[in-house]
């Protein structure tokens, strides 16, 4: 049976939907209508394709990581090089698509949330390109962790609003951005950065990010004589790079799909972001999905060395994949991710983002159990420039025995 999700109400099985206040329903309905029309408009897709090719630099390479493969001694590992996109990560695929959509809707202002800053930079970039007013909401903790990306956003002409509510991280930035959207509904478009939020956001983000998996499918077929890979893998916070990798393979049952979520200091602590391992269904940011919550249903704080993965929920389509067993999700600790960060740097000369390092760490475990005639494709979602100082300080502190 061909996979057809979401349904007309924006649900993936029991997950997703539109759990938003009445004040936002108008905007959500308007967005849904505009998106359906844009999807059917070949000129919209042609403009986006042109930007992806000539501005972003797509298609990105599918690179055979031979030294990493030899080191692990299992499956042939290929890296989908989303780190080579303009702005350094997969986030630009979605940001450009949504700014084009906002322009089509006649909106003049763009707002967005960001954690690691990559979505903020991508959104500020797209807004600069189309001469649109841009405000980025970012948790105060992330503003400190990602000072370089904050400067990049400001350099691109965006205003960065430091959010001091709650735990001052990504979920609080989403709350602030949603509030700002309510206040400026007539002239403002909110660009959700991950496959989260009320319908149609998870579907929009999935569709714009699916360029990743579509390219992989074509590229791998070219080098393998028309075959499909045995497995695909990506890190998962909200889940946009993972859904972009997975979705084009969802009907190919022979292709295993793996997501690497962040278990921070460990699943036996409260310092993690392992929603599938430790969460349960609840409503957050306008959708029903698996979330980290306490016994009273209060959303718990997520924790990860990676600013892009410390979100206490996972997008609804991933929740559905997890429930029906279509994808397998495993958790990776900070320490394992740091080892992955070092390993890829030293073996392949590629410094990955800390988010992507979680996928590299999981790839070591999964590839080792596979045979050399099998293939595993890992989405290298972003480059590690933004994380180098943070990792440097961490290694120095460890060397001093702190």
From Swiss-Prot:
N6-(pyridoxal phosphate)lysine modification, residue list: 91
Catalytic activity field: (1S,2R)-1-C-(indol-3-yl)glycerol 3-phosphate + L-serine = D-glyceraldehyde 3-phosphate + L-tryptophan + H2O
GO MF: tryptophan synthase activity
Protein keywords: Amino-acid biosynthesis, Aromatic amino acid biosynthesis, Lyase, Pyridoxal phosphate, Tryptophan biosynthesis
Top-level division of the source organism's lineage: Bacteria
Keyword rRNA-binding: no
Pathway of action: Amino-acid biosynthesis; L-tryptophan biosynthesis; L-tryptophan from chorismate: step 5/5
Signal peptide positions on this chain: none
PROSITE patterns hit by this protein: TRP_SYNTHASE_BETA
Assigned EC number: 4.2.1.20
Role description: The beta subunit is responsible for the synthesis of L-tryptophan from indole and L-serine.
Similarity comment: family membership: Belongs to the TrpB family.
Self-association state and partner proteins as the record states: Tetramer of two alpha and two beta chains.
Protein name per the record: Tryptophan synthase beta chain
């Amino acid at each position: 049976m061909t996979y057809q999700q979401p349904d007309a109400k924006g649900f993936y099985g029991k997950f997703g939907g539109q759990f938003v206040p009445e004040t936002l329903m108008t905007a959500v309905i308007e967005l849904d209508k505009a998106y359906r029309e844009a999807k059917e408009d070949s000129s919209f897709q042609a403009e986006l394709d042109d930007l992806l090719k000539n501005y972003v630099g797509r298609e990105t390479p599918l690179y055979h990581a031979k030294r990493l493969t030899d080191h692990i001694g299992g499956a042939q590992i290929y890296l989908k090089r989303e780190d080579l996109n303009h702005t350094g990560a997969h986030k630009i695929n979605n940001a450009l698509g949504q700014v084009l959509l906002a322009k089509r809707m006649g909106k003049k202002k763009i707002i967005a949330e960001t954690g690691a800053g990559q979505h903020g930079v991508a959104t500020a970039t797209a807004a600069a390109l189309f001469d649109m007013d841009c405000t980025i909401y970012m948790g105060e903790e992330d503003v400190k962790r990602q000072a370089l990306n904050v400067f990049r956003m400001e350099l691109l002409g965006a205003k960065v609003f430091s959010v001091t509510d709650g735990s001052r991280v990504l979920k609080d930035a989403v709350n602030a951005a949603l509030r700002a959207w309510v206040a400026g509904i007539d002239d403002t478009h909110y660009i959700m950065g991950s496959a989260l939020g009320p319908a149609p956001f998870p579907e929009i983000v999935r569709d714009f990010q699916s360029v990743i998996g579509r390219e992989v499918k074509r590229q791998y077929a070219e080098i393998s004589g028309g075959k499909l890979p045995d497995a695909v893998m990506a890190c998962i916070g909200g889940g946009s790079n993972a859904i972009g990798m997975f979705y084009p393979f969802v009907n190919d049952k022979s292709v295993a799909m793996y997501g690497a979520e962040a278990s921070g200091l460990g699943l036996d602590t409260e310092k993690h972001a392992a929603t599938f391992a430790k969460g349960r269904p609840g409503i957050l940011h306008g959708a029903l999905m698996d979330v980290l919550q306490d016994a009273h249903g209060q959303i718990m704080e997520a924790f990860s060395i990676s600013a892009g993965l410390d979100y206490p929920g996972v997008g609804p389509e991933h929740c559905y994949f997890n429930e029906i067993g279509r994808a397998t999700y495993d958790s990776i600790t900070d320490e394992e991710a740091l080892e992955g960060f070092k390993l890829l740097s030293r073996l392949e000369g590629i410094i990955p983002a800390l988010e992507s390092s979680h996928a590299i760490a999981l790839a070591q475990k999964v590839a080792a159990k596979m045979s050399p005639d099998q293939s595993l494709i890992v989405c290298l979602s972003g480059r590690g420039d933004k994380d180098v100082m943070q990792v440097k300080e961490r290694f120095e502190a460890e060397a001093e025995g702190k």
